[in-house]
Regions:
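Active-site glycine-rich loops that stabilize anionic/oxyanionic intermediates
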Residues: 21, 28-33
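Short beta-to-alpha linker loops that shape the active-site pocket of alpha/beta-hydrolase fold enzymes
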Residues: 30, 57-67, 124, 212
Length: 234
């Protein structure tokens, strides 16, 4: 498989596949990177259908692990905007694949973009609920978060006051892109009710894997993911 590694405005990027007029932007999830297993599978399936794939590292991930820029929503949305602007200059038809929090950043960054199709794996569609769940689990009040600004949780995730404020001030209220969602019934991060509400509100096709988790990583889960891609990449 042809792979070209380069940087777009200092964002480490991989372009997968031979030259084409069609491309998927691939946005990875938390604790992942631009060469994650699901992105490799996406590239394999998309290339078969005549697409290229552009994947990149979010702040604090992959080649950017040691960067000073934190993986905060405002920086990630900015990076996604840089990527889509580059892509629109070089390709005629743009589609989107996003996983977990990568889907959330995409919902914010790409709501006004001309994207033909979106494929979401285990998408985060309500970040405010996830942050508030974490605050509840670890007995962190909004007042304490505001005072301390940054709090490290026992599960290794940092909570930021400015991140929380951004999320509250920028709700997901627009999404008109033709979207397919693959969700695991055993997802411990995103409740089914929230995903289902989003899917119905924005007319997305939702497929649920009974033995799927938030992180698709077993052979069975990745096989289902691959079959789902084969069905929905036209």
């Amino acid at each position: 498989m042809f792979k070209d590694k380069f940087k777009i405005s200092n964002i480490p990027t991989i372009l997968w596949g031979e030259k084409s007029e069609k491309i998927f932007i691939a946005v990875h999830g938390n604790m992942s990177n631009k060469e994650d297993a699901v992105i490799k599978i996406l590239a394999k399936e998309a290339i078969k259908k005549g697409y290229q794939v552009l994947s990149f590292d979010l702040p604090e991930h992959g080649e950017r692990k040691n960067e000073s820029t934190p993986c905060k929503v405002q920086y990630c949305v900015s990076d996604l905007s840089v990527i889509v602007n580059y892509v629109k200059e070089h390709w005629k038809e743009v589609s989107l694949f996003a996983c977990s929090m990568g889907a959330y950043f995409s919902l914010l960054a790409y709501k006004n973009n001309m994207i033909k199709k979106a494929l979401f794996l285990s998408p985060v569609v309500n970040m405010e609920k996830i942050i508030e769940n974490m605050m509840m689990w670890f007995n962190i009040t909004p007042e304490r978060l505001k005072k301390e600004f940054t709090i490290e949780t026992p599960i290794g995730q940092k909570l930021y006051w400015d991140y929380y404020c951004y999320v509250k001030e920028n709700p997901i209220n627009k999404w008109s892109i033709d979207t397919n969602i693959l969700y695991g019934a055993k997802d411990e991060l995103c409740e089914f009710e929230i995903i289902n509400y989003f899917a119905q509100k924005y007319c997305c096709e939702l497929e649920v894997m009974d033995t799927g988790e938030h992180y698709f990583h077993t052979k069975e889960q990745l096989d289902v993911f691959q079959q789902w891609l084969q069905k929905h990449i036209a």
